[in-house]
């Protein structure tokens, strides 16, 4: 009997493979970093072959290190950095260019043009998304417009487009498909009809033949090529990283929310089978689709994402050089009692939700001769929490409800100073689970449900366990004053490049 689910977790800076047992516990991990490519200011790319090679290597490595074979694996679940765009040749399987990463801003001016033409409402109504260069649609158009002969080849059906999940499924199995959660991040998918939208494709001049088939997030979608692992393994779960994390956090009921502190920060609120249209610059997105045919049920989410979360700490390490390791930031920040009046707005790539300002830029305010690197480190950590306050406030307005708790995960959730400040500034309890690898766990759960490795969402919920609960301890007056100062600082950072 197969004892494990293999989760493939393809992230912005690394590829990982994680084995989970029946109890939802980690049995083995393998990870390999790969480089980002920055050809021009505001451009961010990946070598799609480097992604595939690293992902295959870690999948094989985790099996080898744990003395397992393909027959020990019940299924594979895939979770991935979303929106990142790959176009490849259907015959050769080779990309026609580097992948354009979700962080890439090269199509910002084109998005401005579409907004000026009055197209923003149409896109929001159909896709639930704001018209921003963050999403895949404008990246696909850019590649078709700028890579020689790409559009003609696409129209002849020679090329395939996919987000990273599609690319991995294609390399693993030869199938060209995606799931509803990833499709909902493209600006091309109607989240109400659950179909690629012809009107939106026409605006971008994207041939429908380029697009993958859309399948459920939980269900046997394909099987791996025999030669990769020695025997075929079912690919039975697919979800974008943030949707997978929400599922892994057992936020299965409407009103439950989670925040993932990764490269960026992403907060999702489950709204059940009802797609709530945001009036506060949030995204309405598909969380997951379970079941097939008439039994299929799609869950929707409100989402807010900020571009700079843990990446701020990386900048403190690599850009400023004030820490040697990312883990050192907590000790440095706690070496001072407060931020000394320093406020940090980390708008290095603009501001995400709820501002959506591509032209904002990073700002450090309140510096005096008494300011030092510890104050900057503390202000940097606090900026992650402040951005998350803006997200939850907007969500509660849209959902017309108050959250009773916020479940957290991702690398920075291990930082107790940040988590306590997050609870204080939100005035909501923050709960960290025992397993913080919830993105990979969510992909594993989706795959496991499809092959009856787990029987139900209720069984998964019963496995979720709390590690630590952070209760708010800040006075209302202090909270109000701090938030007022934060919003003043955001105003200074906005529209800097316009």
From Swiss-Prot:
Enzyme Commission (EC) number: 2.7.1.30
EC top class, as a word: transferase
Name of this protein: Glycerol kinase
NCBIfam families: glycerol_kin, PRK00047.1
Activation/inhibition comment: Inhibited by fructose 1,6-bisphosphate (FBP).
Family the UniProt entry places it in: Belongs to the FGGY kinase family.
Keyword entries, A-Z: ATP-binding, Glycerol metabolism, Kinase, Nucleotide-binding, Transferase
Binding site residues for ADP: 12, 16, 263, 310, 411, 415
Signal sequence extent: none
InterPro entries: ATPase_NBD, Carb_kinase_FGGY, Carb_kinase_FGGY_CS, FGGY_C, FGGY_N, Glycerol_kin
Natural source organism: Janthinobacterium sp. (strain Marseille) (Minibacterium massiliensis)
Pfam families in alphabetical order: FGGY_C, FGGY_N
Keyword ATP-binding in record: yes
Role this protein plays: Key enzyme in the regulation of glycerol uptake and metabolism. Catalyzes the phosphorylation of glycerol to yield sn-glycerol 3-phosphate.
Lineage, opening ranks: Bacteria, Pseudomonadati, Pseudomonadota, Betaproteobacteria, Burkholderiales
GO cellular component: cytosol
Binding sites annotated in the UniProt record for ATP: 12-14, 263, 310, 314, 411
Binding sites annotated in the UniProt record for glycerol: 82-83, 134, 241-242
């Amino acid at each position: 009997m197969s004892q494990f689910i293999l989760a493939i977790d393809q992230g912005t800076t690394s590829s990982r493979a994680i084995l989970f047992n029946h109890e939802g516990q980690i049995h083995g991990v393998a990870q390999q970093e790969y480089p980002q490519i920055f050809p021009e200011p505001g451009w961010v790319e990946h070598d799609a072959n480097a992604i595939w090679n690293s992902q295959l290597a870690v999948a094989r490595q985790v099996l080898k290190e744990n003395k397992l074979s393909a027959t020990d694996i019940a299924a594979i679940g895939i979770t991935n950095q979303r929106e990142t765009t790959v176009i490849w040749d259907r015959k050769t399987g080779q990309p026609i260019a580097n992948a354009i990463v979700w962080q890439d801003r090269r199509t910002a001016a084109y998005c401005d043009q579409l907004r000026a033409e009055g197209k923003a409402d149409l896109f929001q109504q159909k896709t639930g998304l704001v018209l921003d260069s963050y999403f895949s649609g404008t990246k696909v158009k850019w590649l078709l417009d700028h890579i020689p002969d790409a559009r003609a080849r696409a129209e002849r059906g020679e090329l395939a487009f996919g987000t990273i999940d599609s690319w991995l499924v294609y390399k693993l199995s030869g199938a060209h498909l995606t799931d509803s959660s990833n499709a909902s991040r493209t600006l091309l998918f109607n989240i109400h009809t659950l179909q690629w939208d012809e009107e939106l494709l026409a605006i971008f001049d994207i041939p429908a033949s380029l697009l993958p088939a859309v399948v459920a997030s939980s269900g046997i979608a394909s099987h791996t090529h025999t030669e990769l692992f020695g025997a075929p393994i079912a690919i039975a779960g697919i979800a974008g990283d943030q949707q997978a994390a929400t599922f892994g956090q057992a936020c299965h009921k409407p009103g439950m929310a989670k925040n993932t502190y990764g490269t960026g920060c992403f907060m999702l609120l489950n709204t059940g089978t009802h797609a709530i249209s945001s009036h506060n610059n949030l995204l309405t997105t598909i969380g997951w689709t379970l079941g097939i045919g008439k039994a299929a049920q799609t869950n929707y989410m409100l989402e807010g994402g900020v571009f700079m979360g843990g990446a701020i700490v990386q900048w403190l390490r690599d850009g400023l050089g004030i820490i040697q390791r990312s883990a050192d930031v907590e000790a440095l920040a706690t070496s001072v009692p407060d931020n000394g009046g320093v406020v940090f707005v980390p708008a290095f790539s603009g501001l995400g939700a709820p501002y959506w300002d591509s032209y904002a830029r990073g700002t450090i305010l309140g510096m005096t001769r008494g300011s030092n690197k510890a104050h900057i480190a503390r202000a940097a950590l606090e900026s992650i929490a402040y951005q998350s306050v803006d997200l939850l406030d907007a969500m509660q307005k849209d959902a017309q409800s108050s959250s009773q708790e916020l479940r957290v995960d991702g690398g920075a959730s291990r930082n107790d100073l940040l988590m306590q400040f997050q609870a204080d500034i939100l005035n909501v309890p923050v709960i960290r689970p025992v397993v913080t690898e919830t993105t990979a766990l969510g992909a594993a759960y989706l795959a496991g449900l499809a092959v009856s490795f787990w029987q139900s969402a209720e069984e998964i919920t019963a496995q979720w366990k709390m590690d630590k609960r952070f209760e708010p301890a800040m006075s209302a007056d202090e909270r109000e004053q701090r938030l007022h100062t934060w919003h003043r600082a955001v105003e200074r950072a906005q529209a800097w490049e316009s």
